[in-house]
């Protein structure tokens, strides 16, 4: 096998509650991504996005990686890894520094982002991303790219995302147990946004709802920047459990019934359509109308979308997203999900699938690959920025090496006092 060359190949690893997806992307001569390898395997060892069994998780990752390597014809050495879970926290913050040479340079941007992320967080959390929203130079607001601009004071408005220290450490441990290095850990809804949202939607205002197996992840964008993120601990696994309980069928059959026959809006399901439902033990299978199945599924989707709507209202952005809602993730594929969401949100809703990728497009243009493709696109952006510097995941990049914490603190004090 050929070795994966840094700068030519990018790997995304989506370690989800229901499945592990490994994607290998090759950077083409024109700077585009071509997906050349895909590996998927049922996830064992995670619950609601958090590792609960190291050995089972390692085995699932290894099998997905092996499959992707075989398809791509290369050996994988490192990957961009997604993270999700109810332990994710976020807040908006800002920082202010003096501009040393009256012209903003990369060091000034690094210092102001460091200042902005200097917020009090619990000891068991760590900063995952510091995502720049916009900058203020003196009294000039709305600056998106401050580099090279003149002024005496630089302010950054940022969205800070934190995660549980042990959750991220366990994910890294599992990946390294498979012989891989971790290029970066990325919030999964941020990755999905890279692959399914258009620039126009992010400018106008949009809410991404990524419905996975264990959690539903929310990201709100306005004026081209991320403004709010949240996690709701209800997703596809709850739908499967509802079917298993209501139909008294084993979980593996409930999952198959959900994927093949379920509908999120009962009025769209044909009353005359029937399905066979396997029973528990040696009991014979039973027949059930598809509409009766939909009546089991619809209340859970209704609850989920109502919780998303409540989060939108709590965030204060409900009236600031004229581009509406974009649903993605494996659980968003169900028939009737978009129609039910439109009834609840009273705004435009569409199904988001990855775009702007080449290669195995017939396969990856599917909501279940949104996070995986987004991880590739995130990696492509970092590679084009030199892969040399990331302020806890911010979009800012520099060719300068990252200084030690004490040295950065010393520079910050010198620059401000």
Curated annotation (Swiss-Prot):
Keywords, alphabetical: Cell cycle, Cell division, Cell inner membrane, Cell membrane, Membrane
Chief place of localization: membrane
Record's keyword annotation contains Glycosyltransferase: no
Bilayer disposition of the protein: Peripheral membrane protein
Cross-referenced InterPro entries: ATPase_NBD, Cell_div_FtsA, FtsA/MreB, SHS2_FtsA
Location within or outside the cell: Cell inner membrane
Annotated Gene Ontology cellular component terms: cell division site; cytoplasmic side of plasma membrane
Record has Ligase as a keyword: no
Matching Gene3D superfamilies: 3.30.1490.110, 3.30.420.40
Superkingdom assignment: Bacteria
Gene Ontology biological process terms from the UniProt entry: cell division; FtsZ-dependent cytokinesis
Entries under Pfam families matching the protein: FtsA, SHS2_FTSA
SUPFAM superfamilies according to UniProt: Actin-like ATPase domain
Purpose: Cell division protein that is involved in the assembly of the Z ring. May serve as a membrane anchor for the Z ring.
Annotated family: Belongs to the FtsA/MreB family.
Self-association and partners: Self-interacts. Interacts with FtsZ.
NCBIfam families from the UniProt entry: ftsA, PRK09472.1
Full protein name: Cell division protein FtsA
Lineage: Bacteria, Pseudomonadati, Pseudomonadota, Gammaproteobacteria, Pseudomonadales
